[in-house]
Amino acid sequence: MQANHHALCPQKNAACRITLAIIRVMCYSIGEEINLHKKSVTLGCMIMKTNQKTVEKKERGISKYIPAFAMFAVFETVAVSLWLSLDNLFYLLNFSYIGTCIAIGLALFAGGWKHARRFVQFAVGSYMLVYLGIISNENMQLEGFWYYLFTGVFEAATIHYAVAKIFGPLIFGRGWCGYACWTAMILDLLPYKQPQKPRKKGLGFIRYIMFALSFGLVAALFLCHAGNLERIMFWLFLGGNALYYVIGIVLAFAFKDNRAFCKYICPITVFLKPMSYFALFRIHCDESKCVGCGKCLKVCPMNVECNKESRERVNGTECILCFECKKACPVKAIK
């Protein structure tokens, strides 16, 4: 019996070893399948996340061009409405051109071109100064507005002021100052793009004096029954612009601030500021992201406290939508 028992042991041991080997192989195979499944799941999740990020990126890519499309739509609406109501093709071409230039500029800025605003300034500003003002003999300054208003003619300067400087700011704030003003177009070429000192307090009253003088000058011409008012308006346009450029350049170097004229002297802001307080398009700051570095305050040409989400006087009526603060923000808190 013992002999038989010893004879069977090697056979049992061999069978056990084979069984264990088979079990190991099966376990290894199952483990590999499990690992493969895990890898497949992980890869699938990664692909889903990548696709999701791609979709989000595309959505962000499209959304950043919304302001450009919106401004184009606004100006095209104005262009078509004036064309149909006044039966004058000029208004269709005029406002379509301005709206197209602004839309292209905003799209270029969204695409990362740093000179986009300057493109719009020269495309629109030079068109209004040279073509409308000098070639077409239209006084687009404040005196021209008073002149057409006194004569009861709703065209040219009166329409320009209604769209760009009285009702338009309800939509785009003081965007006129940042993108279309032919005075600022030249002043922005000067070396003091970033104000060297805080805004001067107590000088804002000068704009109201300039506003009153402009009104009084045109009123006096009508009361005195001056002859050839159209010719006088043309020379007032040329002389007024020359005077503005001289004052603006002198103030820029005196205060080391390119936009000193805009802050203290420009009479147009009397129209722009009240409506700009309610502007639809405006700079927003996510204060939860803001790190308080102050870079936005340093680069703002208008000394706007753009790191505060408010509609206070400075924030609500001084911003020209130049987006210098947005470009300077290191944490993308401004949009």
Language model features with spans:
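Charged/polar low-complexity intrinsically disordered segments
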Residues: 2, 11-12, 17, 32-33, ...
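Short, positively charged and aromatic/hydrophobic N-terminal segments
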Residues: 7, 17, 22, 26-29, ...
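Non-ligating segments of multi-cofactor redox enzymes
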Residues: 47-307, 317, 327, 331-335
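Intrinsically disordered, low-complexity N-terminal regions enriched in serine/proline/glycine
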Residues: 12-15, 27, 64
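Secretory-pathway extracellular proteins and peptide precursors enriched for disulfide-bonded cysteines
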Residues: 1, 6-9, 282, 311
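Residue-level detector of alpha-helical transmembrane segments in integral membrane proteins
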Residues: 3-4, 13, 60, 260
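Histidine (H) residue identity feature
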Residues: 5-6, 37, 225, 284
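Short linker/helix segments within small regulatory modules
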Residues: 309-322
